[in-house]
Curated annotation (Swiss-Prot):
Residues 562-571, 618-631 are cytoplasmic. It comes from Bos taurus (Bovine). Residues 1-22 form the signal peptide. This is Dolichyl-diphosphooligosaccharide--protein glycosyltransferase subunit 2. GO terms for cellular component: oligosaccharyltransferase complex. Its main location: endoplasmic reticulum.
Length: 631
């Protein structure tokens, strides 16, 4: 039987909030991303290099160029048999096209073999070896390895090392490739970690993606697991697939190559778990649907998906465990209609098994289970303060409005009691938001109170006019009482017009302007009173001290007049003039410092003037000494 204030449908909301424990993929290629990547690669050919990026990049994604025959003709017509790079692009592109065979001469073969030398760059060696492999020509792998190792010792860049890994994947398994394989561990040590989520080279996305593709291709070739931790693989994956739009063909090609390597190799296949469909279900369809794919959003239908446990976030109690998902088409489904979940948040631990290559295969899903709230036992009461009169109680049923009005004044209080229950299980609920709003029908004033439950989860709101007059500004009148109930786990938040309440405050407490009060009128201007200035001494005092300071100068002039001033040794040499002008300028600078400049500005100017004055004075005194010596 449905409770009052409820509907008969129980709704669940399942929302993936976050993975809070193990490191899981945050970026991968959705089906839309894969199509966008294909569109980035499917461009008109402008050169043999662009043809290589388009053809081989699309091939990595399991696609082909629209016109294979036309592409093959373009490769043959643009091939330069005397250029190693051109031969590399042609050989690799023709391999990715069905029925596109390119024949080369012995001279071209000799050119490629000659390029496999320690005098060539690592890139040239890589292109030559890959071209020979693409054309199906024999190669002395051990000699090529020696040339590659010698050259790599001279080129220690990340890109050169990645190209060395790519080269080694074309060499014979009989060759001793351990020295090249060991470079993988060194490259991993050079990766930069960002926020514990991303891992990449400072050289950028393209180099990082090529490293991933080259590493797994080489490891598949030699049959050894790469020295990369599972968490590092996920961090590399997050960095590579965080970018969705590509500036160049080469960048799109590198991402496609990395995606192909991570989706199919012998050691590490990251698992992507994504919820499917609408987050809301009826009780008859309480089914969690998950898409389990690789990084290219290709379904892993051969996998086995199990729920390890489902725990309540609030109580940490386990409510469901060791339950298998069922594969329906490409989607894994978990039917938990028979389990009575109370509303709230749950942590679902899901594990994907069936292949020992799977990594990031344990996923924590935050699941929100929502329900509908029912309001029961709603009582409205007026309680006499002196308790001389028995309380008057009226029961009202949601969503009806109580008939008549209720009065709260200096003689009696108004009280509201109610309970909140889960309409599906009948369990008591305590939503996060339970408010009582009182709206003045005349002035529009609103006052909101929080309704709190007691120990028995019975909500109570009591209005005592003597205690609440400040909230209401002592504004008497008829108020509409609303009950507001909300929570993230509720499917039916409630705004209920419960009753009309007449609130009367004592006349002495009512402000004369309460109804005409306008809170948006300009406030009274603030007149700031500054501190009274300190009393200064009389002018005669300051003048007296000024005269005392100037008295030595007056004495100097008096003595000059009496005994005479000897200026016979003064010359008009540049050093003499500059010295006296510099000295005067420094005295003037002191005045400017006093009136305008700060200490640091003054020191800067003083350093310039002082240097010039010092040099000029030194020159002037030297000339005076020479003059005395001559006489």
């Amino acid at each position: 039987m449905a409770l009052p204030g409820s509907s008969t449908v129980f709704l669940l909301a399942l929302t993936i909030i976050a993975s809070t424990q193990a490191l899981t993929p945050t970026h991968y290629l959705t089906k839309h991303d894969v199509e966008r990547l294909k569109a980035s690669l499917d461009r008109p050919f402008t050169s043999l290099e662009s043809a290589f990026y388009s053809i081989v990049g699309l091939s990595s994604l399991g696609a082909q160029v629209p016109d294979v025959k036309k592409a093959c003709t373009f490769i043959k017509s643009n091939l330069d048999p005397s250029n190693v790079d051109s031969l590399f692009y042609a050989a690799q592109s023709s391999q990715a096209l069905s029925g596109c065979e390119i024949s080369i001469s012995n001279e071209t073969k000799d050119l490629l073999l000659a390029a496999v030398s320690e005098d060539s760059s690592v890139a040239q060696i890589y292109h030559a070896v890959a071209a020979l492999s693409g054309f199906g020509l024999p190669l002395a792998s051990q000699e090529a390895l020696g040339a590659l190792t010698a050259r790599l010792s001279k080129e220690e860049t990340v890109l050169a090392t990645v190209q060395a890994l790519q080269t080694a994947s074309y060499l014979s398994q009989q060759a001793d490739l351990r020295s090249i394989v060991e470079e993988i561990e060194d490259l991993v040590a050079r990766l930069d970690e960002l926020g514990g989520v991303y891992l990449q080279f400072e050289e950028g996305l393209e180099t990082t993606a090529l490293f991933v593709a080259a590493t797994y291709k080489l490891m598949d070739h030699v049959g050894t697991e790469p020295s990369i931790k599972e968490d590092q693989v996920i961090q590399l994956m997050n960095a590579i697939f965080s970018k969705k739009n590509f500036e160049s063909l080469s960048e799109a090609f590198s991402v496609a190559s990395a995606a192909a390597a991570l989706s199919e190799n012998r050691y590490h296949v990251p698992v992507v778990v994504v919820p499917e469909g609408s987050p809301s279900y009826t009780q008859e369809q309480a089914i969690l649907r998950l898409q389990v794919t690789n990084v290219l959003s290709q379904p892993l239908t051969q996998a086995t998906v199990k729920l390890e446990h489902a725990k309540s976030v609030a109580s940490r109690a386990t409510v469901l465990q060791k339950t298998s998902f069922t594969l329906i088409g490409d989607v894994f489904e978990l039917n938990f209609m028979n389990v009575k979940f109370s509303s709230g948040y749950y942590d679902f631990s899901v594990k994907v098994e069936g292949d020992n290559r799977y990594i990031a295969n344990t996923v924590e899903l935050r699941v929100k289970i929502s329900t509908e709230v029912g309001i029961t036992n709603v009582d409205l009461s007026t309680v006499d303060k002196d308790q001389s009169i028995a309380p008057k109680t009226t029961r009202v049923t949601y969503p009806a409005k109580a008939k008549g009005t209720f009065i709260a004044d200096s003689h009696q209080n108004f009280a509201l009691f109610f309970q909140l229950v889960d309409v599906n299980t009948g369990a008591e609920l305590t939503p996060h938001q339970t408010f009582v709003r009182l709206h003045n029908q005349k002035t529009g004033q609103e006052v909101v109170f929080v309704a709190e439950p007691d120990s028995k989860n019975v909500y109570k709101f009591e209005l005592d006019t003597s205690e609440r007059k400040l909230e209401f500004d002592s504004a008497s009148g008829t108020y509409t009482l609303y009950l507001i109930i909300g929570d993230a786990t509720l499917k039916n938040p409630i705004l209920w017009n419960v009753a009309d309440v007449v609130i009367r405050f004592p006349e002495d407490d009512v402000p004369s302007t309460v109804l005409s009060k306008n809170i948006f009128t300009p406030k009274q201007e603030i007149q700031h009173l500054f501190r009274e200035p300190e009393k200064r001494p009389p002018t005669v005092v300051s003048n007296t001290f000024t005269a005392l300071i100037l008295s030595p100068l007056l004495l100097l002039f008096a003595l000059w007049i009496r005994i005479g001033a000897n200026v016979s040794n003064f010359t008009f040499a540049p050093s003499t003039i500059v010295f006296h002008l510099g000295h005067a300028a420094m005295l003037g600078l002191m005045y400017v410092y006093w009136t305008q400049l700060n200490m640091f500005q003054t020191l800067k100017y003083l350093a310039i003037l002082g240097s010039v004055t010092f040099l000029a004075g030194n020159r002037m005194l030297a000339q005076q000494a020479i003059k005395r010596t001559a006489h």
